[in-house]
Amino acid sequence: MAGVVSVDGLRKRYRSRDPWAVDGVTFALEPGQAFGLLGPNGAGKSTVVKIIAGLLRPDEGKVELFGSDPGDPAARKDLGFAPEDPDFPKFLRAAEVLDYFASLLGLDEQERKRRIPETLEFAGLDKERRQVRQFSKGMKQRLGIAQAILGRPKLLILDEPTADLDPLGRRDVRALIERLKESGVAVLLNSHLLSEVERVCDTVAIMARGRVIKEGKVVDIVPEGRTLEDVFVELIQATTPPREQLPSFISDQRPS
C-alpha cells in the first residue's frame, strides 16, 4: 500500500533574509499510523502542516501526499482537518451540521442519509439531539472530528484535539483516534499535551528551530521509567541558547 505522506529534505522560509522556518525536515507517515509532530512555539510545525495540506509551497525538498503533489486536488480530497476550536452554528444539531458539510462535499441525498448516521455513530454522537450551543468542549471536539472524516479521508490532521478537555473528554477523543487508526486512517497530531501524544501516537518527530532533532517510535525514544515529556524537555533545553532559557531563580520554582 502506498505511503500517506513523504517529506524529504523540506526547507521553507517566508522571506529571503529570514532564517529557515523549516530546515531539512524528513519523515514519512503510513496508513493506520498516528504521528505526533511536536515542538515549542515557532519550531516550524505549522509550516510543515500547511505544506502537507497544499496551503504553502516548499522552497526546497520534496513532499508527497498519497504519491502526488500536495497541490493536486485528487490528493487533497483524501485529507481531513480538525482545528483546535471547531466553530459551528450554535442552533444546529449535530446531524444538521454534518448535513451542511455533506452538501459542500457534493454528496447526494441518498449518500448523505447513509453517511451522516454512520459518522455520528463513529464519533459517539448518534444519540445526541441537543443543539451545538449545549455541547461540552469535548462534544464539540468530537463533532469537529466527525466533520473532518465525513469525506472519508485517508489522512486526518488534528490540531490540539484534547486541549482544554477534562479527563473524560480526553478519553473520548483518544478512543476516537484509536478507532480511526484501526480503520486504516493515518493521523497527524499536533499537540502540546505530551502525555496524550505518548498514549495515542506510534511515532513522533520533535522539532526545534525548524529542524527535526529526534524522530522515531515512541517505545524506542522514551527510556523505561521516563516519559515523553522528560525526553522533550531535555532535547529542547539542549538546543536552546542559554540567553533564551529561564533564569535559574525562575526555573527552580517551576513545578516538578
Say what each PLM segment does.
Residues 142, 152, 235-242, 253:
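Short, leucine/isoleucine-rich alpha-helical interaction segments at C-terminal helix-coil junctions
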Residues 3-5, 12-189, 194-208, 213-214:
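ABC transporter nucleotide-binding domains
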Residues 19, 181, 225-229, 241:
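Short glycine/proline-enriched turn or capping motifs at secondary-structure junctions
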Residues 211-233:
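Conserved beta-strand-loop-alpha-helix hinge in the C-terminal portion
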Residues 105, 204, 225, 236-240:
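Conserved NTP-handling cores and scaffolds of large molecular machines
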Residues 227-234, 238-239, 245-247:
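N-terminal low-complexity Pro/Gly-rich stretches
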Residues 1-13, 241-256:
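ABC-family P-loop ATPase nucleotide-binding domain
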Residues 119-122, 224, 235:
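Short acidic/histidine-centered micro-motifs embedded in hydrophobic/aromatic stretches
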